[in-house]
Swiss-Prot record:
Its EC number is 5.3.1.-. It is an enzyme of class 5 (isomerase). Pfam families: AP_endonuc_2 (PF01261). Belongs to the rhamnose isomerase family. GO terms for molecular function: isomerase activity; metal ion binding. Its cofactor is Mn(2+). Signal peptide: none annotated. This is Probable sugar isomerase mlr5709. Keywords: Isomerase, Manganese, Metal-binding. Mn(2+) binds at H257, D289, D291.
């Protein structure tokens, strides 16, 4: 039996106070869904199986280019991060895996595995870092990494990615995510074609080191840290990379890495259709790559993304098995609370998408009834699925209200007393 950090008594007490209302709400929603030909228990069962990974760096306090304001009880190392992730998993029952970032989370792999298994956690995709310089690094990535003009720097970046794979093999991970900051700030600074060719050559060396049962995820981003051009700037370039590398290379979609107002759900559909959707980094944004909490700004867009995912799931799309992870920066909130709510919002979008009357939708589409087609989607989106999500948590041992239970447990105050306070502000995302 896995250990838990929040006491069972606290969880049970909070659940007991909320259970009668939840049961009434669940029964009421069940009756309404039954009139639509939907079995609420079947939807709940699917929600219970849905999972999203927590990024190790997400449990720390985030920042911006201008400042970072330390939070109380920040994790001191990866082992503190694992404990924070265990709290999220315990209360939401939706986040059973942690995604590590190397070298930020570098430690003895066997010790890491033991620490995670203590709380019933596993490890999701490994994340390499060639967008900043490590303390003991020989060559700098200031002017690029996998696309750098210097062969030695490219080789160093390749070796780092291969090291991430080796660490991941011990941990039981099955994927490597590669995001680079390579690009330029001025016209003429780099030759677009040569830089991309160097990147492809380097990534082929990384792909060659991939175990047979692993996947390689490449992540595109329109801008930042480079502001004139980025080597892997959009889904078109990302798709070319995945096609060039091989069958185990896929495109990873971060919801904040696109130009404003881009139709992300259509990009998702295209990548599914051509069997190159690897997975997601869920977050939300208003202006750019804001890394805000998932569903906090545009929950309808999140629903529309999941509408495409559920459509692929139900139609049995070939090779469809996307990875799900949160990727956020928490500057003014408790990271644990934000990550719990974000995991729930991702589940919410999934549950709502499961309610879409797909037979009716297809009929309206084929009949060119634009109004009723969009109303069919809106009918699912407007349905309050909170009772389904809460009941799923209750049935699997989680908290009906994760944030209220977390606050009642006093976890943040406890770790703030144990972990030395970080003093002084700084700039930087993490």
């Amino acid at each position: 039996m896995s250990e838990t950090i929040i006491s069972a008594e606290v969880v049970e007490k909070n659940n007991a106070a909320r259970k009668p209302d939840l049961e009434r709400d669940y029964a009421s929603l069940g009756e309404r869904l039954d009139r639509r030909g939907i079995a609420i228990d079947a939807i709940r069962a699917k929600v219970e199986k849905f999972a999203v990974a927590i990024p190790s760096w997400g449990v720390g306090t985030g920042g911006t280019r201008f400042a970072r304001f330390p939070g109380a009880g920040e994790p001191r190392d990866i082992f503190d991060k694992i404990e924070d992730c265990a709290v999220i998993s315990q209360l939401t029952q939706a986040t059973p895996t942690v995604s590590l970032h190397i070298p930020w989370d570098k430690a003895d792999p066997n010790r890491l595995k033991q620490a995670a298994s203590r709380f019933g956690l596993g490890f999701d995709a490994m994340n390499s870092n060639t967008f900043s310089d490590a303390r003991d690094q020989k060559l700098s990535y200031k002017f690029g990494s996998l696309s750098h003009a210097d062969a030695g720097t490219r080789r160093q970046a390749v070796e780092h990615n291969l090291e991430c794979i080796e660490i991941g093999k011990t941990l039981g991970s099955k994927a490597l995510t590669v995001w680079i900051g390579d690009g330029s700030n001025f016209p003429g600074q780099v030759n677009f074609a040569r830089a991309f060719e160097r990147y492809l050559d380097a990534m082929k060396a990384v792909y060659a080191g991939l175990p047979a049962d692993w996947k390689l995820f490449t992540e595109h981003k329109m801008y930042e840290p480079a502001f004139y051009s980025t080597v892997v700037q959009d889904w078109g370039t990302n798709y070319l990379i995945a096609k060039e590398l091989g069958d185990r290379a896929f495109c990873l979609v971060d919801l904040g890495h696109h130009a404003p107002n881009v139709n992300i759900e259509m990009i998702v559909s295209r990548l599914i259709q051509f069997k190159k959707l690897g997975g997601f980094h869920f977050n939300d944004s208003k202006y750019g790559d804001d890394d805000l909490d998932a569903g906090s700004i545009d929950p309808y867009r999140l629903f529309l993304v999941f509408n495409e995912l559920v459509d692929a799931e139900l139609s049995g799309a070939e090779g469809f098995d996307p990875a799900h992870m949160l990727d956020q920066s928490h500057n003014v909130t408790d990271p644990i609370e934000s990550l719990m709510l974000s995991a729930v919002e991702v589940q919410r979008a999934y549950a709502q998408a499961l309610l879409v009357d797909r037979k009716a939708l297809e009929g309206f589409q084929d009949g060119n009834d634009a109004l009723m087609a969009t109303q069919t989607l809106k009918a699912a989106y407007r349905t309050d699925v909170e009772p389904i999500l809460a009941m799923a948590r209750l049935k699997t041992g989680g908290a009906i209200d994760p944030v209220a239970t977390y606050r009642a447990a006093g976890y943040r105050a406890k770790v703030a007393a144990e972990r030395p306070a970080v003093t002084g502000g700084s700039g930087g995302i993490v």
